[in-house]
Amino acid sequence: TFGRISGDNFALLRCYRDIDDLVARFLRCSDLLTRFEGLANRRFRVEMIAGIYLVERPEDILSIDDMLDRANLAQKSVKHLSGSKYALYSEEMRKRVLYEKNIESCMEEALRNREFCLHLQPQVDIQHGDALFGAEVLVRWERPGYGMVSPGDFIPLFERNGFIVDLDAFVFEEACAYLASRGSRGLPPLRLSVNVSRLSIAQGDFLDRYSAIRDKYGIDSGMLELECTETMVIRNFALFRELMAALPSRGFRSAMDDFGTGYSSLNMLKEIALDVLKLDIAFFRDTEGTPRERAVVESIVQMARALGMSTVAEGVEKQEQVEFLRSIGCSAIQGFIFSRPVPLALFESVEASFPLYVEG
């Protein structure tokens, strides 16, 4: 049985003996549609994706509406499966959707009740005595009655729903408040790197708003670094090029995270001004790699230095990695080898275990 449900949604109900055969048939149909050139001199791009609900046992037989709902849920999940055109429904999929809906339902309340807190992960200068000079600011969410919500779960949902703009601003202000508190207690300067999303940066008053927050707390110029990912920069190049050019005059530093995970890295660096290049661990995970692999990492570090950037290697866990990165002139390290991210209340005790950083 084949029928149109609505719009461009169709349903197929059929018996099968081999799921692999069913999938193969679907992929052949999808391939034919992809090659469809159009009608009346008009070209079209046609794609087909499918959500599949399998009835393998008597208890799998549900009402038509319930089976369609499950197939539709599987179809919606296809976009999260890179390169896939179909997905099979599973109970884990249903639980995941319910979990995400629960998170989405309490986002606004969580922001209003300030359920979020900051953790800091130290950044250590490996060229000057392994002194701690800064930290990356990471946000954590502890939901009353639930516990910790994984950042990997809630941050994409905040981005999807637009609440990431308010969350970014909250994190930035909390970071400023912490730096002001350190200053009032006579603690040494600390540079904080704060992540910002594309949606926040796209706000017309982004720099004015963040500058006003910083000035309210009297934070010195250069003590706050705005960090974005390489993927964000590649996908929104004009927006980020304009931002990076404006940051120095506003007293902010800039950093690009996950360098090397995209495809336009080297060409991009010619056109944007950055203070810090953060190297993805994929570049140096295997310090016993081939001479070619080691040469690539060293070349990136040298290139960054020639362009006036410092380099921070993320995800470092082994002493051999530290020594390799030190030997090629990498500026700093952020990783479990020195410290995991820690709550603000514990950061200063961790900081005390490192040598005092002296600028220059």
Language model features with spans:
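EAL-family c-di-GMP phosphodiesterase catalytic domain
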Residues: 144-145, 197-204, 223-238, 250-360
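Catalytic core of bacterial c-di-GMP phosphodiesterases, primarily the EAL and HD-GYP domains
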Residues: 58, 128-136, 163-239, 315, ...
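Active-site core of bacterial EAL-family cyclic-dinucleotide phosphodiesterase domains
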Residues: 99-157, 195, 256, 313, ...
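Surface-exposed amphipathic alpha-helices with a cationic face
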Residues: 30, 179-183, 214-215, 241-249, ...
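Cyclic-dinucleotide signaling modules
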Residues: 1-101, 105
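Residue-level recognition of strand-loop junctions within catalytic nucleotide-signaling folds
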Residues: 12-17, 34, 55-56, 142, ...
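C-di-GMP signaling machinery
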Residues: 56-59, 73-119, 158-162, 198-207, ...
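Short catalytic/binding micro-motifs of nucleotide second-messenger systems
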Residues: 31-43, 178-184, 214, 355-357
